[in-house]
């Protein structure tokens, strides 16, 4: 009985450790930096809370002792179109090289992760790929609103399909290079 309790306790502890690590490596990081007011009002208007001079802030943080890596992400929402249908998505602009360096809890089920050479590449969640019948090599159009309310769109090539620990995330998530997200928005 005691051995069973100890083993099940260890199993539960391991599940929590893996959940924490996959959340850190897939979505949030250990620490997030954002402008004052973002946590209260930024969910409604995230583009109003963009960080001024992000490269300078990243350099300052990276120079701190015990900091191993700093990377930027830009979250946005929009529509992904395969030429036949639209799907509402949540998007992240990422720094592909730094993502690869840090490691991630994203598992590729088709294709590959984004690389620095993929200026207009996109990786999509497994649910997104299924809903729009996407495979690597397909082209999609990503549509989003700019901060001043205009609608912008860019074409991307699907370079990979990923899976995370969260099916809900995979059903709506896409990742593009940070520069592409900045151009889109």
Give the residues covered by each predicted segment.
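Alpha-helical transmembrane segments of integral membrane proteins
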Residues: 1-4
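Hydrophobic, regular-secondary-structure patches
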Residues: 9-90, 112-113, 117-118
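Short beta-strand/turn micro-motifs at beta-sheet edges
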Residues: 21, 180-185
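Short, charged/polar surface micro-motifs in flexible loops or helix N-caps
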Residues: 39, 96-98
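Extracytoplasmic/secreted envelope proteins and their assembly/folding machinery
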Residues: 55-58, 178, 182
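Hydrophobic secondary-structure segments that place a key small or acidic residue at a functional site
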Residues: 73-76, 85-95, 107-179
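Cytochrome P450 core scaffold surrounding the K-helix E-X-X-R motif
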Residues: 98-106
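Residues that scaffold the ATP/ADP-binding catalytic core of kinase and kinase-like folds
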Residues: 101-102, 131-132, 184
């Amino acid at each position: 009985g005691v051995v069973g309790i100890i083993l099940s306790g260890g199993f539960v502890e391991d599940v929590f450790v893996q959940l924490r690590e996959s959340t850190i490596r897939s979505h949030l990081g250990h620490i997030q930096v954002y402008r004052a007011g973002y946590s209260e009002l930024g969910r409604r208007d995230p583009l109003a809370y963009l960080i001024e001079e992000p490269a300078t802030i990243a350099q300052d943080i990276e120079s701190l002792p015990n900091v191993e890596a700093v990377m930027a992400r830009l979250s946005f929402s929009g529509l992904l179109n395969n030429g036949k249908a639209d799907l509402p998505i949540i998007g992240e602009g990422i720094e592909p090289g730094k993502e690869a360096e840090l490691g991630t809890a994203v598992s590729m089920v088709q294709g590959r992760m984004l690389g620095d050479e993929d200026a207009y590449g996109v990786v999509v969640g497994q649910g997104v790929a299924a809903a729009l019948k996407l495979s690597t090599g397909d082209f999609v159009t990503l549509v989003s609103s700019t901060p001043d309310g205009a609608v912008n769109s860019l074409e991307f090539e699907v370079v990979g399909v990923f899976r995370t620990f969260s099916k809900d995330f995979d059903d709506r998530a896409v990742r593009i290079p940070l520069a592409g997200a900045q151009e889109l928005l």
